[in-house]
């Protein structure tokens, strides 16, 4: 019934199996891939023809994690998987980016890749396996895909690269780098690093590319026996139309691309496009094969060619800069003084308004992954409203691009954050892109660094980011620093690098062509380092270090630790005690299972009150220490005082005051607040207290000499009796 084909290799110490022909046989391509005991199903289906007037390639990649893969039932009311999580969206992008450039030019058939995680061994991350499975399914499908590609994860532990580290090994790694590419070229890199050098990062890319070669060989081996016949696809020839249009618009288009203002430049280009359409209008009426869409397609190609020729021939860019110059930078902090931290970072025509907010453990985000639920204390949200590029548009929930750009900035900042113990706050950063002309994600990195320091978050070092570009024609190439939007769209590479003065914290690279050599990447990294250091120097004009004091509007959090066995006493029966502390002090209190307590409040006094209250519950009173207490009962022989939480002790009538006391109620009454010193314990372990040794106004201990003097002054009868006794003893002698 099944005609299955399978290849199996040993890869990084674990078996990798790619199988086709058993599952999802009606898809154009379907693969079940297994790595260790993690299993994914990848399918691809492409329409037989493009939709009419389709002017782009509609590729959709959906990555989905099934909870049954780890023996779980989904939460929520409906108990089924719903909209993609942030993690699923990010992995969908991770798969999309290296495969998209490999579809043949002008292929516009609706294409969908679906990758499902159907088993997870909690050891091998399914993202790399999903990329491999998608590549294999495309290679087998007969769709015009110039693959295969493969990917690998690279770690860096103890000065050595590690291929495909397991989930347990990743916390020890200073690098989390994913690289994907073909047999001969790197197409995509994404990473988070702990201030690693350019040499280490480049070495990791090369190490990863070599590491995934056996996988490409395995996919080719499977395709030789299981691939479908290639679909016939002949790209439309626009060469004659291109030559004709180039003669008509080259001069005007070159002139338009010397206009430095983005909106003015776009207006000039739109005018040229409108004019060329009007010139071809008579011909379009008689030639049904010549359409406005074809003219628009050729016009876009000519735009790319002219921009590229200008840069390669003159070394000058669209806005007049040379190849390595960064646009003018303006950094401002504290522009929204009632927020916890804020910054406005402007670089040329790209601008980010970034705001940091500090919260408590109640604000932590719970992230439900296949590997378990974790709590995220650093959130970074990137928003790209349509007005930032002078357009109208629909405002909705964040799209894939916004989620991806936010995560890129998150990776850049995350290694520089203080530990949870050193800074026990939940941090949320929102980056509002208010203007955009390229590199908005890197503006977010710079703005986030400034906003966090303005909020008083003690970053290890400031972080900056820069986007690099590439124009390559044959053997000629140039590397561009701080690329514009047009240079991104019309160039061959988008290479984003973020880091500190000490090294790289995040790197993301997307390459649209083959032939990017190690030397080109090395030049790009070195040029990016110079640009990054320049940006850091410009940022330092606004703020160099984190503010030493938090905003007056920020919550204050203090931590204390109690013995685990005392947690029950602090919480109380049914939470009675902890609720009373919260209600009386106004502080928020969070108790961890290990005995760590976080106390949060905008008011320092309420924090101190809550801390003292908790100390009174878990600590034992010490002899010689002064405490404030409440009189709970009076008797003929003294008063009982409740102090230091639930502790009770007796102040004997002789210890109520320095003078002789006839009745206890002459000095204290029930409900009075008094200061007492713990004198010790009687033979039955009962607490002995004294009021007379403490100044009841200040709560300070009275010096012994002063106490004796006061007693003599306030008890003259007792003094006379003592002198009479001494006189009688002398007479007897």
UniProtKB/Swiss-Prot annotation:
Q: What gene name is given for the protein in this entry?
A: pnp
Q: What is this protein called in UniProt?
A: Polyribonucleotide nucleotidyltransferase
* Region of interest (Disordered), residue spans: 698-733
What GO CC annotations are associated with the protein? Answer: cytosol
Q: What is the protein's species of origin?
A: Bartonella bacilliformis (strain ATCC 35685 / KC583 / Herrer 020/F12,63)
Keywords, alphabetical: Cytoplasm, Magnesium, Metal-binding, Nucleotidyltransferase, RNA-binding, Transferase
Query: What family does this chain come from, according to its entry?
Result: Belongs to the polyribonucleotide nucleotidyltransferase family.
Q: Which residues cross the membrane?
A: none
Question: What does this chain do?
Answer: Involved in mRNA degradation. Catalyzes the phosphorolysis of single-stranded polyribonucleotides processively in the 3'- to 5'-direction.
Which catalytic reaction applies to this protein? RNA(n+1) + phosphate = RNA(n) + a ribonucleoside 5'-diphosphate
Positions of Mg(2+) binding: 488, 494
Q: Which Gene3D superfamilies match?
A: GHMP Kinase, N-terminal domain, K Homology domain, type 1, Nucleic acid-binding proteins
Q: Where is the composition biased (Basic residues)?
A: 722-733
The answer, when asked if Lyase is one of the entry's keywords, is: no
Q: Which cofactor does it need?
A: Mg(2+)
Q: What is its main location?
A: cytoplasm
Bias category Basic and acidic residues: which stretches? 702-721
């Amino acid at each position: 019934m099944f005609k299955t084909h399978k290849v199996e290799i040993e890869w990084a110490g674990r078996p990798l199996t790619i199988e086709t022909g058993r599952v999802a046989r009606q898809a154009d391509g379907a693969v079940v891939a297994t790595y260790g005991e993690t299993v994914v199903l990848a399918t691809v289906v492409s329409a037989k023809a493009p939709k009419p007037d389709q002017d782009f390639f509609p590729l959709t990649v959906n990555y989905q994690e099934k909870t049954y893969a780890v023996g779980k039932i989904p939460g929520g009311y409906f108990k089924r998987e719903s909209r993609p999580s942030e993690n699923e969206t990010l992995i969908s992008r991770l798969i999309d980016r290296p495969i998209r450039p490999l579809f043949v030019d002008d292929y516009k058939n609706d294409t969908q890749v679906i990758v499902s995680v159907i088993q997870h061994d909690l050891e091998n991350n399914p993202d790399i396996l999903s990329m491999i499975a998608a590549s294999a399914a495309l290679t087998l499908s007969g769709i015009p895909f110039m693959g295969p590609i493969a990917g690998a994860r690279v770690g860096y532990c103890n000065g050595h690269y590690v291929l495909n580290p397991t989930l347990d090994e990743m916390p020890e790694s200073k690098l989390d780098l994913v690289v994907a590419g073909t047999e001969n070229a790197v197409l995509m890199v994404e990473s988070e690093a702990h201030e690693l050098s350019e040499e280490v990062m480049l070495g990791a890319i090369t190490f990863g590319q070599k590491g995934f070669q056996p996988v490409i060989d395995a996919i080719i081996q499977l395709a030789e026996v299981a691939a479908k016949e290639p679909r016939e696809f002949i790209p439309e020839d626009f060469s004659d139309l291109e030559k004709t249009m180039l003669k008509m618009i080259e001069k005007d288009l070159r002139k338009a691309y010397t206009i430095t203002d983005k909106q003015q430049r776009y207006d000039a280009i739109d005018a040229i496009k409108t004019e060329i359409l009007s010139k071809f209008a008579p011909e379009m009426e008689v030639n049904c094969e010549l359409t406005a869409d074809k003219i628009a397609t050729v016009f876009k190609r000519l735009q790319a060619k002219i921009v590229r020729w200008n840069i390669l021939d003159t070394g000058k860019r669209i806005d007049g800069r040379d190849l390595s110059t960064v646009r003018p930078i303006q950094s401002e902090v504290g522009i929204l003084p009632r927020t916890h931290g804020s910054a406005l970072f402007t670089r040329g025509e790209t601008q980010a308004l970034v705001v940091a907010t500090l919260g408590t453990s109640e604000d932590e985000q719970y992230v439900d992954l296949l590997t378990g639920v974790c709590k995220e204390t650093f959130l970074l949200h990137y928003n790209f409203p349509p007005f930032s590029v002078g357009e109208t548009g629909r405002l909705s929930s964040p799209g894939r691009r916004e989620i991806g750009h936010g995560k890129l900035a998150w990776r850049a900042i995350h290694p520089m954050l203080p530990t949870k113990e050193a800074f026990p706050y939940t941090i949320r950063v929102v980056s509002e892109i208010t203007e955009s002309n390229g590199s908005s994600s890197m503006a977010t990195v710079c703005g986030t660094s400034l906003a966090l320091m303005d909020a008083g978050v003690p970053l290890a070092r400031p972080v900056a980011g820069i986007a690099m570009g590439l124009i390559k024609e044959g053997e000629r190439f140039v590397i561009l620093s701080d690329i514009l939007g047009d240079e991104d769209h019309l160039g061959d590479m988008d290479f984003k690098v973020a880091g500190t003065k000490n090294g790289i914290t995040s790197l993301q690279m997307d390459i649209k062509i083959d032939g990017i050599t190690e030397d080109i990447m090395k030049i790009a990294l070195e040029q990016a380092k110079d640009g990054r250091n320049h940006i850091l120097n410009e940022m330092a004009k606004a703020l160099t270090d984190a503010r030493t004091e938090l905003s007056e509007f920020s919550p204050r959090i203090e931590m204390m630790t109690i013995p685990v066995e005392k947690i029950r006493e602090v919480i109380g029966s049914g939470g009675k005690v902890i609720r009373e502390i919260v209600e009386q002090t106004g502080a928020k209190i969070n108790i961890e299972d290990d005995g760590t307590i976080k106390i949060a409040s905008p008011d320092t006094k309420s924090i101190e009150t809550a801390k003292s209250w908790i100390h009174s519950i878990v600590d034992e009173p010490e002899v010689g220490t002064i405490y404030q207490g409440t009189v709970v009962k009076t008797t003929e022989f003294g008063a009982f005082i409740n102090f230091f939480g639930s502790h009770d002790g007796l102040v004997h009538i002789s210890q109520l005051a320095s003078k002789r006391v006839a009745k206890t109620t002459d000095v204290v009454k029930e409900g009075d607040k008094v200061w007492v010193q713990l004198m010790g314990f009687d033979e039955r372990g009962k607490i002995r207290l004294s009021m007379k040794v403490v100044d009841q106004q200040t709560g300070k201990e009275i010096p012994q000499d002063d106490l004796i003097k006061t007693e003599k002054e306030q008890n003259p009868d007792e003094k006379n009796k003592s002198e009479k006794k001494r006189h009688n003893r002398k007479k007897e002698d």
